[in-house]
Amino acid sequence: MLQVQGVFKSYATPQGPLAVLQGVDLQLEHGSSLALMGESGSGKSTLLHLVAGLDQIDRGSIRAGRHRLDQMSEAQLAHWRRTEIGLVFQQFNLISSLPVEDNLAFQARLAGRYDPAWQAQLIERLGLGALLKRYPEQLSGGQQQRVAIGRALASRPGLLLADEPTGNLDEATSDEVLQLLLDLLKNTPTSLLMVTHSPRVAARLATRVVLHCGRLADAGER
């Protein structure tokens, strides 16, 4: 279970501190999903980065299972990211020196959870079969996004963090990715926290949470 309690975050600017999150509380149960929505600058991506341990909170607490993330060292956070979560951010961060098939398996191997049968299923579901020997620079933005999604899912993470997971995909591929995520949520204990601007994506996948000016403004069931 993921618990975000009373989280504040601000950044220094030439005009003074900019408050991005102001006392946000969220709870995400095992096997459930939550969609963060709201206008640009409302704090959605910031919250996702804080939950991933990629930035430090100013005040509050973030717990994921037995871990208190805001009290972990950088080394502990790095190990946690490698072994327990999957990340799909708008910067795909594929490894340029590895072909698609090795990019897909990279995190699963680090986590000690590489499963050839599961990887083959991901390759088929994401339509990556013809791309396995290509390198990231040879892929379109949508193709890179599909590889990033497959890499994040390959280790069957307990928590999947996704920032606009279907943002660069055509509608048919987007629907296939959404169905893959729904199947994963249904058949495994994976939890999903995602940022999306798409009401259609949020309605299919998740309970909706709206942030406004760094505060929780609204929440509703899908």
Stretches found by the model and what they are:
Residues C213-R222:
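Conserved switch/coupling elements of ABC/ABC-like ATPase nucleotide-binding domains
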Residues L2-C213:
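ABC family nucleotide-binding domain
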